[in-house]
């Protein structure tokens, strides 16, 4: 931005930002090479809106914009102690947003995105009305956000990825929320946002100022497991896989030995979706990890941090995937099937293994209801050599962020909604059976405008639920949310799989995915963390989306064609451009 090449302009802009309470005025001047005189004129005009009572312009003391935002938000201030962070507005406040309709989002009869338990509670508790500008599925969401950014059609608050955050910061489209956050975040919200030692807050910080609220989560929740159809294993007299060789032998057997016993050649071994990784369902991240490859994160090699997607171990995994594809162990049409289409195959009994997230059984719970013999079990990522356990790659604690538009009239309302979501879902006054997951299995946790969660709470819940089911603890040790999981898991154990009961058992019960992840990766330290956790650099924001797209295209072509020289060409191109 040419305006920042002028030292006087930079000083004036900082001054205007201060007297306007943090409004990012770069938006008024973005991508225009202004002279010092033009900037001074603009400063004078904007200064008229911040006059003192006697008609003079306020002259505040210059602020230090290099303050560490983590410490300010974590500790708060004397003024923040005087703010009722749950106070209801006297007059209605409207907040506009957009929605990523996540996997399996459903509403009780009569409810909708516009009218549900959370939108009603916003109005009841805070007098805030939510206006959804648009909504779309996960696969289209990033594209629609890009269009909104390009057209400058920004709602009051929306969820963005790291590259989009950097783009909007550079464009001056988002608000500096340092003071708003400091004054309005509830203590519990501050605690959760800083639960990773401040890394998430650092990723949302530019030049010492906070420009987004990180959608903090648990990196461990991004670890993958291998889901296997154990009824097919039983039919063929096979054991659960422990090594890569075991996995590949099972894939061959599931493809060639009629595991469903219907006498028809209609099954294959490993489910894969068209984008290979990123969906969490039929996601090859775990397959790559089995080969000690980590294609979607930055990896610490000791003396340098490198992109995992161009390391030599990836080539070995690609060779194996092509062999499996050529042998019919992977759907020949995987390249055109999104996760929903792959799920149709899995639910219809055409596939027997897939790598994915802990929640994957949510998508096929209905298939379990129709056929109780339909049984899947999660196992840890197989070991390559049978001796050294595989390490699961973990994303950063924050990969998405909530940004507030520079034009938002009530930025504190967004913070209030976040406080409310966290408190009613996980705080001392939580009602998880209403605001998290209902007894009927509706995931109301998907409905809020903004939401975060304590990073380890699901793993704690799984340990406690499993202990009670195993008779090692009393049900009275469970909180309301955990009791809900326990009751649903018990129903599934008794043969009642409806209302997502089986899905809850497969997450929280004995042998469930959360326990597999915690015991095999976390306790033993078998993880590879994303080594980059700051806000994206200018080069990252500009080049990484294009390079990632090229990576996906080249990986897919290699699986289909088996030309491993393309990987070497891809690496050379990456190093040249990146």
Placement of each model-derived feature along the sequence:
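Extracytoplasmic/periplasmic substrate-binding proteins
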Residues: 101-117, 220-227, 234-240, 274-327, ...
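C-terminal motif of bacterial Sec signal peptides marking the signal peptidase cleavage site
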Residues: 43-47
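Helix-loop-helix "hinge/cap" segment bordering the ligand-binding cleft or interdomain interface
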Residues: 205-279, 299-345, 350, 402-439, ...
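General small-molecule cofactor/ligand-binding pocket signal
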Residues: 129-135, 333, 377-379
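Paired acidic/hydrophobic, glycine-rich loop segments that form the ligand-binding mouth/hinge
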Residues: 155-159, 352-357
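Conserved N-terminal structural module of periplasmic/extracytoplasmic solute-binding proteins
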Residues: 4-6, 11-20, 28, 34, ...
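Sec-dependent N-terminal signal peptides
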Residues: 32-40
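Conserved small-residue motifs centered on glycine
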Residues: 424-554
